Protein backbone atom coordinates (compact mmCIF):
# COMPACT_ATOMS: atom_id res chain seq x y z
CA UNK A 1 0.00 0.00 0.00
CA UNK A 2 1.42 3.37 -1.02
CA UNK A 3 1.81 6.27 1.36
CA UNK A 4 -0.79 8.21 -0.64
CA UNK A 5 -3.31 5.38 -0.35
CA UNK A 6 -2.66 5.04 3.37
CA UNK A 7 -3.23 8.78 3.75
CA UNK A 8 -6.58 8.56 1.96
CA UNK A 9 -7.75 5.70 4.18
CA UNK A 10 -6.77 7.71 7.25
CA UNK A 11 -9.12 10.51 6.16
CA UNK A 12 -12.17 8.29 6.48
CA UNK A 13 -14.01 9.22 9.69
CA UNK A 14 -15.11 6.85 12.43
CA UNK A 15 -18.85 6.28 12.64
CA UNK A 16 -18.96 7.28 16.31
CA UNK A 17 -17.35 10.62 15.51
CA UNK A 18 -19.84 11.28 12.73
CA UNK A 19 -22.79 10.45 14.96
CA UNK A 20 -21.62 12.94 17.58
CA UNK A 21 -21.78 15.72 15.00
CA UNK A 22 -24.84 17.96 15.48
CA UNK A 23 -25.79 17.61 11.80
CA UNK A 24 -26.56 13.92 12.39
CA UNK A 25 -28.97 14.51 15.28
CA UNK A 26 -31.92 15.39 13.05
CA UNK A 27 -31.06 12.54 10.67
CA UNK A 28 -31.18 10.06 13.55
CA UNK A 29 -34.49 11.53 14.76
CA UNK A 30 -36.00 11.32 11.27
CA UNK A 31 -34.70 7.98 10.02
CA UNK A 32 -33.68 6.16 13.19
CA UNK A 33 -30.27 5.41 14.69
CA UNK A 34 -30.07 1.89 13.24
CA UNK A 35 -30.71 2.91 9.62
CA UNK A 36 -28.26 5.83 9.77
CA UNK A 37 -25.52 3.57 11.14
CA UNK A 38 -26.23 0.91 8.49
CA UNK A 39 -25.92 3.49 5.73
CA UNK A 40 -22.71 4.95 7.15
CA UNK A 41 -21.12 1.50 7.19
CA UNK A 42 -22.20 0.98 3.60
CA UNK A 43 -20.78 4.35 2.57
CA UNK A 44 -17.47 3.63 4.30
CA UNK A 45 -17.21 0.39 2.34
CA UNK A 46 -17.95 2.30 -0.87
CA UNK A 47 -15.30 4.89 -0.04
CA UNK A 48 -12.68 2.19 0.61
CA UNK A 49 -13.47 0.62 -2.79
CA UNK A 50 -13.08 3.99 -4.53
CA UNK A 51 -9.74 4.55 -2.81
CA UNK A 52 -8.55 1.08 -3.76
CA UNK A 53 -9.66 1.37 -7.39
CA UNK A 54 -8.92 5.02 -8.23
CA UNK A 55 -6.67 6.38 -5.48
CA UNK A 56 -9.15 9.18 -4.70
CA UNK A 57 -11.85 9.98 -2.18
CA UNK A 58 -15.50 10.15 -3.30
CA UNK A 59 -16.64 13.76 -3.61
CA UNK A 60 -19.36 13.23 -1.00
CA UNK A 61 -16.69 12.64 1.67
CA UNK A 62 -16.57 16.43 1.96
CA UNK A 63 -20.03 16.42 3.57
CA UNK A 64 -21.15 13.09 4.99
CA UNK A 65 -24.34 14.43 6.57
CA UNK A 66 -25.51 15.95 3.29
CA UNK A 67 -24.91 12.69 1.41
CA UNK A 68 -26.66 10.61 4.08
CA UNK A 69 -29.62 13.00 4.01
CA UNK A 70 -29.85 12.83 0.21
CA UNK A 71 -29.71 9.03 0.14
CA UNK A 72 -32.22 8.54 2.94
CA UNK A 73 -34.59 11.12 1.48
CA UNK A 74 -34.59 9.25 -1.82
CA UNK A 75 -34.95 5.92 -0.04
CA UNK A 76 -37.97 7.21 1.90
CA UNK A 77 -39.84 8.25 -1.23
CA UNK A 78 -42.86 6.15 -2.07
CA UNK A 79 -42.44 3.76 -4.99
CA UNK A 80 -45.76 5.12 -6.28
CA UNK A 81 -44.78 8.74 -6.90
CA UNK A 82 -47.05 11.37 -8.43
CA UNK A 83 -45.92 12.43 -11.90
CA UNK A 84 -47.06 14.94 -14.50
CA UNK A 85 -48.18 12.89 -17.49
CA UNK A 86 -47.39 14.79 -20.69
CA UNK A 87 -46.80 11.71 -22.84
CA UNK A 88 -49.91 12.31 -24.92
CA UNK A 89 -51.47 9.05 -23.69
CA UNK A 90 -54.46 9.76 -21.46
CA UNK A 91 -55.01 6.26 -20.06
CA UNK A 92 -51.34 5.39 -19.65
CA UNK A 93 -51.04 1.85 -18.28
CA UNK A 94 -47.56 2.44 -16.83
CA UNK A 95 -48.77 5.61 -15.11
CA UNK A 96 -51.85 4.09 -13.50
CA UNK A 97 -54.53 4.55 -16.19
CA UNK A 98 -57.65 6.51 -15.15
CA UNK A 99 -57.41 9.38 -12.69
CA UNK A 100 -60.10 9.06 -10.05
CA UNK A 101 -62.94 11.52 -9.57
CA UNK A 102 -62.92 13.52 -6.35
CA UNK A 103 -66.01 11.63 -5.22
CA UNK A 104 -64.12 8.34 -5.65
CA UNK A 105 -61.09 9.64 -3.74
CA UNK A 106 -63.31 10.72 -0.85
CA UNK A 107 -65.13 7.39 -0.85
CA UNK A 108 -61.86 5.45 -0.67
CA UNK A 109 -60.57 7.63 2.17
CA UNK A 110 -63.77 7.00 4.13
CA UNK A 111 -63.59 3.25 3.51
CA UNK A 112 -59.98 3.18 4.71
CA UNK A 113 -60.61 5.20 7.88
CA UNK A 114 -63.71 3.44 9.12
CA UNK A 115 -65.45 0.06 9.25
CA UNK A 116 -67.97 -0.09 6.40
CA UNK A 117 -70.95 -2.22 5.44
CA UNK A 118 -68.91 -4.31 3.01
CA UNK A 119 -70.82 -7.53 3.66
CA UNK A 120 -73.26 -6.39 6.33
CA UNK A 121 -76.99 -5.84 5.84
CA UNK A 122 -78.23 -3.01 8.04
CA UNK A 123 -81.88 -3.97 7.52
CA UNK A 124 -81.71 -7.39 9.16
CA UNK A 125 -78.25 -7.30 10.80
CA UNK A 126 -77.26 -10.30 8.70
CA UNK A 127 -74.52 -10.95 6.21
CA UNK A 128 -74.81 -9.02 2.98
CA UNK A 129 -73.12 -9.45 -0.41
CA UNK A 130 -70.22 -7.20 -1.34
CA UNK A 131 -71.30 -6.87 -4.98
CA UNK A 132 -74.95 -6.07 -4.31
CA UNK A 133 -74.88 -2.25 -4.23
CA UNK A 134 -72.71 -2.08 -7.34
CA UNK A 135 -74.84 -4.63 -9.16
CA UNK A 136 -77.93 -2.53 -8.46
CA UNK A 137 -76.18 0.58 -9.79
CA UNK A 138 -75.04 -1.20 -12.94
CA UNK A 139 -78.53 -2.57 -13.51
CA UNK A 140 -79.94 0.95 -13.16
CA UNK A 141 -77.39 2.52 -15.51
CA UNK A 142 -77.30 -0.18 -18.19
CA UNK A 143 -80.56 -2.10 -17.84
CA UNK A 144 -78.81 -5.45 -17.33
CA UNK A 145 -80.24 -8.19 -15.11
CA UNK A 146 -77.27 -8.60 -12.76
CA UNK A 147 -73.57 -7.89 -12.34
CA UNK A 148 -70.42 -9.29 -10.74
CA UNK A 149 -67.24 -7.43 -9.71
CA UNK A 150 -63.68 -8.82 -9.58
CA UNK A 151 -60.27 -7.16 -9.38
CA UNK A 152 -59.54 -6.63 -13.10
CA UNK A 153 -60.82 -7.58 -16.54
CA UNK A 154 -58.31 -10.41 -16.95
CA UNK A 155 -59.81 -11.92 -13.79
CA UNK A 156 -63.29 -11.30 -15.19
CA UNK A 157 -62.51 -13.26 -18.36
CA UNK A 158 -60.92 -16.08 -16.35
CA UNK A 159 -63.92 -16.34 -14.02
CA UNK A 160 -66.42 -16.08 -16.86
CA UNK A 161 -64.80 -18.97 -18.72
CA UNK A 162 -64.06 -21.15 -15.68
CA UNK A 163 -67.60 -20.88 -14.33
CA UNK A 164 -69.43 -21.49 -17.60
CA UNK A 165 -67.17 -23.53 -19.87
CA UNK A 166 -64.58 -25.53 -17.87
CA UNK A 167 -63.99 -28.91 -19.50
CA UNK A 168 -65.72 -27.81 -22.70
CA UNK A 169 -65.02 -25.94 -25.93
CA UNK A 170 -65.25 -22.21 -26.54
CA UNK A 171 -65.51 -21.04 -30.14
CA UNK A 172 -63.59 -17.83 -31.00
CA UNK A 173 -62.63 -16.17 -34.26
CA UNK A 174 -58.93 -16.43 -35.08
CA UNK A 175 -58.89 -12.67 -35.66
CA UNK A 176 -59.92 -12.07 -32.03
CA UNK A 177 -57.23 -14.06 -30.20
CA UNK A 178 -55.84 -10.95 -28.60
CA UNK A 179 -52.79 -10.36 -26.45
CA UNK A 180 -52.74 -7.42 -24.08
CA UNK A 181 -49.89 -6.07 -21.94
CA UNK A 182 -47.92 -8.51 -19.82
CA UNK A 183 -48.41 -11.38 -22.32
CA UNK A 184 -52.05 -11.89 -21.30
CA UNK A 185 -53.38 -13.99 -24.17
CA UNK A 186 -56.88 -15.31 -24.66
CA UNK A 187 -55.66 -18.87 -25.51
CA UNK A 188 -53.59 -18.95 -22.30
CA UNK A 189 -56.53 -17.76 -20.21
CA UNK A 190 -58.71 -20.46 -21.71
CA UNK A 191 -56.22 -23.13 -20.72
CA UNK A 192 -56.09 -21.78 -17.17
CA UNK A 193 -59.89 -21.81 -17.06
CA UNK A 194 -59.95 -25.45 -18.15
CA UNK A 195 -61.50 -24.70 -21.54
CA UNK A 196 -60.57 -25.92 -24.99
CA UNK A 197 -60.13 -23.19 -27.57
CA UNK A 198 -61.83 -23.89 -30.88
CA UNK A 199 -60.67 -21.15 -33.23
CA UNK A 200 -62.53 -20.52 -36.46
CA UNK A 201 -62.13 -18.42 -39.58
CA UNK A 202 -58.95 -16.62 -40.59
CA UNK A 203 -57.08 -13.64 -39.23
CA UNK A 204 -58.99 -11.17 -41.40
CA UNK A 205 -62.27 -12.93 -42.27
CA UNK A 206 -64.68 -15.01 -40.20
CA UNK A 207 -68.21 -15.91 -41.33
CA UNK A 208 -71.29 -17.13 -39.47
CA UNK A 209 -70.90 -20.51 -41.11
CA UNK A 210 -67.44 -20.87 -39.54
CA UNK A 211 -69.05 -20.72 -36.10
CA UNK A 212 -71.88 -23.03 -37.17
CA UNK A 213 -69.51 -25.74 -38.39
CA UNK A 214 -67.46 -25.55 -35.18
CA UNK A 215 -70.36 -26.18 -32.79
CA UNK A 216 -70.63 -29.72 -31.45
CA UNK A 217 -71.99 -31.54 -28.39
CA UNK A 218 -69.03 -30.30 -26.31
CA UNK A 219 -69.43 -26.60 -27.17
CA UNK A 220 -70.15 -24.42 -24.13
CA UNK A 221 -69.87 -20.89 -25.51
CA UNK A 222 -69.57 -18.74 -28.58
CA UNK A 223 -67.20 -15.93 -27.63
CA UNK A 224 -66.54 -12.50 -29.07
CA UNK A 225 -63.40 -10.60 -28.05
CA UNK A 226 -63.38 -6.90 -28.81
CA UNK A 227 -60.04 -6.07 -30.44
CA UNK A 228 -59.68 -2.87 -28.46
CA UNK A 229 -55.87 -2.63 -28.75
CA UNK A 230 -55.47 -3.26 -32.49
CA UNK A 231 -57.44 -3.01 -35.71
CA UNK A 232 -57.56 -5.24 -38.77
CA UNK A 233 -58.42 -3.19 -41.84
CA UNK A 234 -58.86 -3.85 -45.53
CA UNK A 235 -60.31 -7.12 -46.82
CA UNK A 236 -62.09 -8.12 -43.61
CA UNK A 237 -65.25 -9.82 -42.42
CA UNK A 238 -66.58 -10.33 -38.91
CA UNK A 239 -70.06 -11.02 -37.61
CA UNK A 240 -71.45 -8.81 -34.89
CA UNK A 241 -72.96 -9.88 -31.58
CA UNK A 242 -76.56 -9.69 -32.83
CA UNK A 243 -75.85 -12.12 -35.66
CA UNK A 244 -73.85 -14.40 -33.38
CA UNK A 245 -76.64 -14.37 -30.76
CA UNK A 246 -79.17 -15.40 -33.42
CA UNK A 247 -76.90 -18.28 -34.38
CA UNK A 248 -76.39 -19.17 -30.72
CA UNK A 249 -80.14 -19.33 -30.12
CA UNK A 250 -80.55 -21.58 -33.12
CA UNK A 251 -77.82 -23.91 -31.84
CA UNK A 252 -78.68 -23.47 -28.13
CA UNK A 253 -75.24 -22.07 -27.26
CA UNK A 254 -74.87 -18.85 -25.20
CA UNK A 255 -72.73 -15.94 -26.41
CA UNK A 256 -70.28 -14.05 -24.18
CA UNK A 257 -68.14 -11.01 -24.98
CA UNK A 258 -64.87 -9.71 -23.58
CA UNK A 259 -65.33 -6.03 -24.32
CA UNK A 260 -62.02 -4.89 -22.84
CA UNK A 261 -62.29 -1.11 -22.46
CA UNK A 262 -66.01 -0.76 -21.94
CA UNK A 263 -67.68 2.65 -22.04
CA UNK A 264 -71.03 3.18 -20.33
CA UNK A 265 -71.86 6.23 -22.45
CA UNK A 266 -71.90 6.88 -26.17
CA UNK A 267 -68.60 8.70 -26.65
CA UNK A 268 -69.70 10.11 -30.00
CA UNK A 269 -71.94 12.63 -28.18
CA UNK A 270 -68.71 14.19 -26.88
CA UNK A 271 -67.09 14.28 -30.30
CA UNK A 272 -65.05 11.14 -29.64
CA UNK A 273 -65.00 7.91 -31.67
CA UNK A 274 -67.80 5.55 -30.69
CA UNK A 275 -66.88 2.46 -28.67
CA UNK A 276 -69.24 -0.52 -28.13
CA UNK A 277 -71.20 -0.26 -24.88
CA UNK A 278 -72.05 -3.22 -22.61
CA UNK A 279 -75.74 -2.34 -22.55
CA UNK A 280 -75.90 -2.48 -26.35
CA UNK A 281 -74.46 -5.99 -26.38
CA UNK A 282 -76.77 -7.19 -23.60
CA UNK A 283 -79.74 -5.72 -25.50
CA UNK A 284 -78.58 -7.71 -28.53
CA UNK A 285 -78.88 -10.89 -26.46
CA UNK A 286 -75.32 -11.53 -25.28
CA UNK A 287 -75.43 -13.56 -22.05
CA UNK A 288 -72.33 -12.08 -20.36
CA UNK A 289 -70.14 -9.05 -21.09
CA UNK A 290 -66.88 -8.27 -19.27
CA UNK A 291 -65.03 -4.95 -19.26
CA UNK A 292 -62.53 -2.85 -17.28
CA UNK A 293 -63.22 -0.29 -14.59
CA UNK A 294 -60.08 1.80 -15.09
CA UNK A 295 -60.18 2.49 -18.80
CA UNK A 296 -62.96 4.39 -20.57
CA UNK A 297 -65.26 3.99 -17.58
CA UNK A 298 -62.84 6.20 -15.64
CA UNK A 299 -62.87 4.36 -12.32
CA UNK A 300 -60.52 2.11 -10.32
CA UNK A 301 -58.95 -1.09 -11.58
CA UNK A 302 -61.76 -3.63 -11.59
CA UNK A 303 -63.28 -6.32 -13.76
CA UNK A 304 -67.00 -5.90 -14.33
CA UNK A 305 -69.24 -8.65 -15.68
CA UNK A 306 -72.85 -7.87 -16.56
CA UNK A 307 -75.51 -10.12 -18.00
CA UNK A 308 -78.21 -12.68 -17.40
CA UNK A 309 -79.12 -13.35 -13.78
CA UNK A 310 -78.71 -17.13 -13.95
CA UNK A 311 -75.28 -16.81 -15.59
CA UNK A 312 -74.09 -14.24 -13.04
CA UNK A 313 -75.26 -16.58 -10.25
CA UNK A 314 -72.92 -19.27 -11.60
CA UNK A 315 -70.03 -16.82 -11.44
CA UNK A 316 -70.87 -15.71 -7.91
CA UNK A 317 -70.92 -19.29 -6.62
CA UNK A 318 -67.67 -20.37 -8.30
CA UNK A 319 -64.64 -20.88 -5.98
CA UNK A 320 -62.54 -18.50 -8.10
CA UNK A 321 -64.87 -15.61 -7.28
CA UNK A 322 -63.54 -15.36 -3.73
CA UNK A 323 -59.94 -15.48 -4.95
CA UNK A 324 -60.62 -12.72 -7.48
CA UNK A 325 -63.00 -10.51 -5.51
CA UNK A 326 -62.41 -6.76 -5.20
CA UNK A 327 -61.55 -5.15 -1.87
CA UNK A 328 -63.48 -2.42 -0.07
CA UNK A 329 -61.36 0.43 -1.48
CA UNK A 330 -61.97 -0.69 -5.06
CA UNK A 331 -65.67 -1.14 -4.43
CA UNK A 332 -65.94 2.27 -2.76
CA UNK A 333 -64.21 4.02 -5.67
CA UNK A 334 -66.22 2.13 -8.26
CA UNK A 335 -69.53 2.89 -6.57
CA UNK A 336 -68.70 6.60 -6.38
CA UNK A 337 -67.66 6.59 -10.04
CA UNK A 338 -70.80 4.80 -11.18
CA UNK A 339 -72.97 7.27 -9.29
CA UNK A 340 -71.57 10.02 -11.51
CA UNK A 341 -73.18 8.25 -14.46
CA UNK A 342 -76.61 8.85 -12.90
CA UNK A 343 -76.12 12.54 -13.79
CA UNK A 344 -74.78 12.41 -17.37
CA UNK A 345 -75.12 16.17 -17.88
CA UNK A 346 -72.21 16.73 -15.45
CA UNK A 347 -70.15 13.69 -16.40
CA UNK A 348 -67.61 15.43 -18.65
CA UNK A 349 -66.84 17.87 -15.85
CA UNK A 350 -66.66 15.50 -12.87
CA UNK A 351 -65.08 12.42 -14.46
CA UNK A 352 -61.37 13.17 -15.07
CA UNK A 353 -60.97 10.65 -17.90
CA UNK A 354 -63.82 12.14 -19.91
CA UNK A 355 -62.74 15.69 -19.04
CA UNK A 356 -59.24 15.09 -20.40
CA UNK A 357 -60.42 13.23 -23.48
CA UNK A 358 -62.83 16.02 -24.42
CA UNK A 359 -60.41 18.95 -24.05
CA UNK A 360 -60.39 20.78 -27.36
CA UNK A 361 -57.22 21.34 -29.36
CA UNK A 362 -57.95 25.08 -29.29
CA UNK A 363 -57.99 25.20 -25.47
CA UNK A 364 -54.78 23.18 -25.27
CA UNK A 365 -53.15 25.42 -27.90
CA UNK A 366 -53.92 28.54 -25.84
CA UNK A 367 -52.48 26.85 -22.76
CA UNK A 368 -49.30 25.95 -24.64
CA UNK A 369 -48.86 29.51 -25.86
CA UNK A 370 -49.31 30.80 -22.32
CA UNK A 371 -46.60 28.49 -20.98
CA UNK A 372 -44.14 28.88 -23.84
CA UNK A 373 -42.66 32.24 -22.82
CA UNK A 374 -41.46 31.38 -19.28
CA UNK A 375 -40.08 28.05 -20.45
CA UNK A 376 -38.28 29.63 -23.41
CA UNK A 377 -36.72 32.17 -21.06
CA UNK A 378 -35.50 29.39 -18.76
CA UNK A 379 -34.31 26.85 -21.37
CA UNK A 380 -33.62 29.10 -24.35
CA UNK A 381 -29.83 28.97 -24.04
CA UNK A 382 -29.81 25.26 -24.84
CA UNK A 383 -33.14 24.54 -26.53
CA UNK A 384 -35.61 26.09 -28.93
CA UNK A 385 -38.97 25.95 -27.13
CA UNK A 386 -41.90 25.90 -29.55
CA UNK A 387 -45.65 25.28 -29.60
CA UNK A 388 -46.53 22.56 -32.09
CA UNK A 389 -49.69 20.62 -33.01
CA UNK A 390 -49.69 16.93 -32.10
CA UNK A 391 -52.02 13.96 -31.72
CA UNK A 392 -52.90 12.41 -28.37
CA UNK A 393 -53.98 8.81 -27.96
CA UNK A 394 -56.51 7.36 -25.54
CA UNK A 395 -54.30 4.49 -24.39
CA UNK A 396 -54.70 1.22 -22.47
CA UNK A 397 -55.83 -0.55 -25.61
CA UNK A 398 -58.80 1.78 -26.13
CA UNK A 399 -59.61 2.93 -29.68
CA UNK A 400 -56.10 2.06 -30.94
CA UNK A 401 -56.26 3.75 -34.35
CA UNK A 402 -58.01 6.94 -33.23
CA UNK A 403 -56.08 10.09 -32.34
CA UNK A 404 -57.14 13.33 -30.66
CA UNK A 405 -55.83 16.68 -31.99
CA UNK A 406 -53.77 18.39 -29.30
CA UNK A 407 -50.89 20.82 -28.78
CA UNK A 408 -47.42 20.35 -27.33
CA UNK A 409 -44.45 22.28 -26.09
CA UNK A 410 -41.37 20.96 -27.88
CA UNK A 411 -37.72 21.29 -26.89
CA UNK A 412 -35.14 21.08 -29.69
CA UNK A 413 -31.41 21.29 -28.83
CA UNK A 414 -29.66 24.10 -30.67
CA UNK A 415 -26.72 21.81 -31.46
CA UNK A 416 -29.01 19.01 -32.67
CA UNK A 417 -27.49 16.43 -30.33
CA UNK A 418 -29.93 13.75 -29.24
CA UNK A 419 -27.94 13.13 -26.08
CA UNK A 420 -29.07 16.56 -24.84
CA UNK A 421 -32.70 15.46 -25.18
CA UNK A 422 -32.00 12.29 -23.21
CA UNK A 423 -30.24 14.34 -20.55
CA UNK A 424 -33.12 16.80 -20.29
CA UNK A 425 -35.70 14.02 -20.04
CA UNK A 426 -33.60 12.35 -17.33
CA UNK A 427 -33.37 15.63 -15.37
CA UNK A 428 -37.14 16.00 -15.47
CA UNK A 429 -37.60 12.43 -14.24
CA UNK A 430 -35.50 13.34 -11.17
CA UNK A 431 -37.72 16.27 -10.17
CA UNK A 432 -39.73 16.06 -6.91
CA UNK A 433 -42.76 15.60 -9.15
CA UNK A 434 -41.30 14.03 -12.32
CA UNK A 435 -42.43 15.44 -15.66
CA UNK A 436 -42.83 12.68 -18.25
CA UNK A 437 -42.81 13.52 -21.95
CA UNK A 438 -41.63 11.65 -25.03
CA UNK A 439 -38.72 12.00 -27.44
CA UNK A 440 -39.66 11.87 -31.10
CA UNK A 441 -38.27 13.27 -34.34
CA UNK A 442 -35.36 15.10 -32.72
CA UNK A 443 -37.52 16.87 -30.12
CA UNK A 444 -38.73 16.33 -26.58
CA UNK A 445 -42.53 16.66 -26.70
CA UNK A 446 -44.77 17.69 -23.81
CA UNK A 447 -48.35 17.04 -24.94
CA UNK A 448 -50.46 19.29 -22.69
CA UNK A 449 -53.76 17.40 -23.00
CA UNK A 450 -53.46 16.04 -19.46
CA UNK A 451 -52.02 19.20 -17.87
CA UNK A 452 -54.50 20.76 -15.44
CA UNK A 453 -52.17 22.02 -12.69
CA UNK A 454 -50.09 24.66 -14.48
CA UNK A 455 -48.62 26.08 -11.28
CA UNK A 456 -47.10 22.80 -10.19
CA UNK A 457 -45.84 22.21 -13.75
CA UNK A 458 -44.01 25.54 -13.80
CA UNK A 459 -42.66 25.04 -10.29
CA UNK A 460 -41.05 21.81 -11.44
CA UNK A 461 -39.67 22.92 -14.81
CA UNK A 462 -38.40 26.29 -13.65
CA UNK A 463 -36.37 24.84 -10.78
Curated annotation (Swiss-Prot):
Gene Ontology terms for molecular function? L-seryl-tRNA(Sec) selenium transferase activity
> Which UniProt keywords are given for this protein, alphabetically ordered?
Cytoplasm, Protein biosynthesis, Pyridoxal phosphate, Selenium, Transferase
- List, separated by semicolons, the cofactors it needs: pyridoxal 5'-phosphate
* Residues modified to N6-(pyridoxal phosphate)lysine: 295
Task: Name its pathway.
Answer: Aminoacyl-tRNA biosynthesis; selenocysteinyl-tRNA(Sec) biosynthesis; selenocysteinyl-tRNA(Sec) from L-seryl-tRNA(Sec) (bacterial route): step 1/1
Q: What is its main location?
A: cytoplasm
Q: How does it assemble?
A: Homodecamer; pentamer of dimers. Binds only one seryl-tRNA(Sec) per dimer.
Give the family, as the similarity comment puts it.
Answer: Belongs to the SelA family.
PANTHER family xrefs: L-SERYL-TRNA(SEC) SELENIUM TRANSFERASE (PTHR32328:SF0)
Name the record gives this protein: L-seryl-tRNA(Sec) selenium transferase
Give the species.
Answer: Shigella dysenteriae serotype 1 (strain Sd197)
Amino acid sequence: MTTETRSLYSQLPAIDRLLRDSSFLSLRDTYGHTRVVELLRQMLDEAREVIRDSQTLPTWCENWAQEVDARLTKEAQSALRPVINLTGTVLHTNLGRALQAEAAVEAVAQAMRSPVTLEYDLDDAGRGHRDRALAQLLCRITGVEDACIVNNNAAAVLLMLAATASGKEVVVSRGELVEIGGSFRIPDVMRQAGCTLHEVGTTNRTHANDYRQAVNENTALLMKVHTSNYSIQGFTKAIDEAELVALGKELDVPVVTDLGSGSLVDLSQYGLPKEPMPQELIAAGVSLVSFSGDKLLGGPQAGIIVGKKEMIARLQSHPLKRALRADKMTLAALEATLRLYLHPEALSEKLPTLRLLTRSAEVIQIQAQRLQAPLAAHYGAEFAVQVMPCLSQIGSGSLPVDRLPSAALTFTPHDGRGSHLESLAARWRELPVPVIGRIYDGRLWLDLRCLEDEQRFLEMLLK
